[in-house]
């Protein structure tokens, strides 16, 4: 079986003690939270894809400035390598955009860590970290290994 392969960009956006996440549904109809992001188009860089996807899904303008994680996901006949960037907000206004509606996203909003206790969150690794540590200069990019995706890629 031939696998479809794609590269994707995701945004980790921290504001004080909050993180910006979007709520989506998987193919089973269960909802989950994930950092905004999506596939890289053939004519753009990974950082440009991150900027575009965040704008399309949230209305927020960002600047990616550090790679935090590299995620390697498998789902049926698909494989996605996702680069997670730490991003600064530089403009825009959080809104439910037309792009988000078309993608089936339910909401985009800021969450405190205590609000995520009973939620399914991707990348799951972010729950275990002090989000302030992402900003530190000595942060080393982490490869998260190959995982089966919990949702359709």
PLM regions: where:
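Unchanged
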Residues: 40-63, 73-122, 151-153
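Conserved S-adenosyl-L-methionine
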Residues: 65-69
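Conserved Nudix-box catalytic region and its N-terminal flanking loop in Nudix hydrolases
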Residues: 18-56
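Conserved N-terminal beta-strand and adjoining loop/helix that marks the start
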Residues: 1-19, 70
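A beta-strand edge to alpha-helix "cap/lid" segment located at domain peripheries
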Residues: 2, 121-124
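Short connector loops at helix/strand junctions that flank enzyme active sites
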Residues: 6, 14, 28, 35, ...
């Amino acid at each position: 079986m031939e696998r479809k392969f794609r590269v994707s960009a995701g945004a980790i956006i921290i504001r004080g003690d909050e993180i910006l996440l979007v709520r989506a549904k998987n193919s089973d109809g269960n909802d989950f939270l994930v950092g905004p992001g999506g596939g890289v188009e053939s004519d753009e860089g990974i950082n440009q894809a991150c900027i575009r996807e965040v704008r399309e899904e949230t209305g927020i303008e960002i600047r990616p400035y550090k790679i935090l994680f590299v995620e390697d996901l498998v789902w049926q006949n698909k494989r996605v390598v996702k680069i997670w960037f730490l991003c600064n907000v530089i403009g825009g206004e959080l809104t439910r955009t037309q792009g988000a509606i078309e993608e089936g996203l339910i909401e985009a909003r800021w969450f405190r860590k205590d609000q995520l206790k009973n939620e399914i969150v991707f990348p799951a690794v972010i729950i275990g970290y002090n989000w302030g540590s992402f900003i530190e200069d000595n942060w080393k990019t982490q490869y998260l290994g190959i995982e089966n995706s919990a949702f359709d890629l």
